[in-house]
Swiss-Prot record:
Keywords: DNA condensation, DNA-binding. It holds the Pfam family Bac_DNA_binding. This is DNA-binding protein HU. One of its GO terms (biological process) is chromosome condensation. It comes from Thermotoga maritima (strain ATCC 43589 / DSM 3109 / JCM 10099 / NBRC 100826 / MSB8). Signal peptide: none annotated. Residues 57-90 are annotated as: Disordered. InterPro entries: Hist_DNA-bd (IPR000119), Histone-like_DNA-bd_CS (IPR020816), IHF-like_DNA-bd_dom_sf (IPR010992). Histone-like DNA-binding protein which is capable of wrapping DNA to stabilize it, and thus to prevent its denaturation under extreme environmental conditions.
Length: 90
């Protein structure tokens, strides 16, 4: 499902204007992104949680030179589904 399709479905279910739903969705995504950038964990009960975790440094290969390289440790966003979401997906 694309963002546009999500907006269409939510607008139809809620009986709201697509423009309003888009603004709300954009604001939610921006707020989650800002919180993660600050290192905060975002929990939505019944849905799941978003957090930033560290990905350990690892060995890799430079695709242009084929020489071994070390890929440095980095921060990556992670999503952990909540119990209710897991149950619905089963």
């Amino acid at each position: 499902m694309t963002k546009k399709e999500l907006i269409d479905r939510v607008a139809k279910k809620a009986g709201a204007k697509k423009k309003d739903v888009k603004l709300i969705l954009d604001t939610i995504l921006e707020t989650i992104t800002e919180a993660l950038a600050k290192g905060e964990k975002v929990q939505i009960v019944g849905f799941g949680s978003f957090e930033v975790r560290k990905a350990a440094a690892r060995k890799g290969v430079n695709p242009q030179t084929r020489k071994p390289i070390t890929i440095p440790e980095r921060k990556v966003p992670k999503f952990k589904p909540g119990k209710a979401l897991k149950e619905k997906v089963k």
